[in-house]
Amino acid sequence: MEMLPLVKIAPEYNLTLDPSTGMIGAALGREVIILSMDEINEQIAELEATADDLINSLDPTTTPLDSYPGREGVYLTAGKLTNMVYGFILGLIILFALLL
């Protein structure tokens, strides 16, 4: 396997890219310290799952990401209860305004 030259991606920070493996490392003279991106990739995957869950929460028939089984329609039920409470409070305010 042919060794490709390292590509400097940020010379001011001495960061280089190994094009054959896709690893980012710090260049110290002729030596390179290889940094593992596995932990960062795991955090990015977790963030993507959370963002997808936020988008899916706009559909009232979906379930939250870490919920127990059988929780389909929880957003729909929460929306109905919230609207009932708002309607009750608004009705009380109108009733008191008419009585005074």
From Swiss-Prot:
InterPro entries, sorted: MtrB_MeTrfase (IPR008690)
Domain of life assignment: Archaea
Record's subcellular location: Cell membrane
Catalyzed reactions: 5-methyl-5,6,7,8-tetrahydromethanopterin + coenzyme M + 2 Na(+)(in) = 5,6,7,8-tetrahydromethanopterin + methyl-coenzyme M + 2 Na(+)(out)
Listed pathway(s): One-carbon metabolism; methanogenesis from CO(2); methyl-coenzyme M from 5,10-methylene-5,6,7,8-tetrahydromethanopterin: step 2/2
Single GO molecular function: tetrahydromethanopterin S-methyltransferase activity
Biological process terms in GO annotation: methanogenesis, from carbon dioxide; methylation; one-carbon metabolic process
Residues in the signal sequence: none
EC number: 7.2.1.4
Bilayer topology: Single-pass membrane protein
Short name of one Pfam family: MtrB
Record flagged with keyword Mitochondrion: no
UniProt keyword annotations, A-Z: Cell membrane, Membrane, Methanogenesis, Methyltransferase, One-carbon metabolism, Transferase, Translocase, Transmembrane, Transmembrane helix
Coarse class of the protein's main subcellular location: membrane
Entry's transmembrane regions: 80-100
Keyword check for Zinc: no
Assembly: The complex is composed of 8 subunits; MtrA, MtrB, MtrC, MtrD, MtrE, MtrF, MtrG and MtrH.
Function of the molecule: Part of a complex that catalyzes the formation of methyl-coenzyme M and tetrahydromethanopterin from coenzyme M and methyl-tetrahydromethanopterin. This is an energy-conserving, sodium-ion translocating step.
HAMAP family membership: MtrB
NCBIfam families: methano_MtrB (TIGR04166), PRK00965.1 (NF002129)
Family: Belongs to the MtrB family.
The protein's name: Tetrahydromethanopterin S-methyltransferase subunit B
Protein species of origin: Methanothermobacter thermautotrophicus (strain ATCC 29096 / DSM 1053 / JCM 10044 / NBRC 100330 / Delta H) (Methanobacterium thermoautotrophicum)
Gene name per UniProt: mtrB
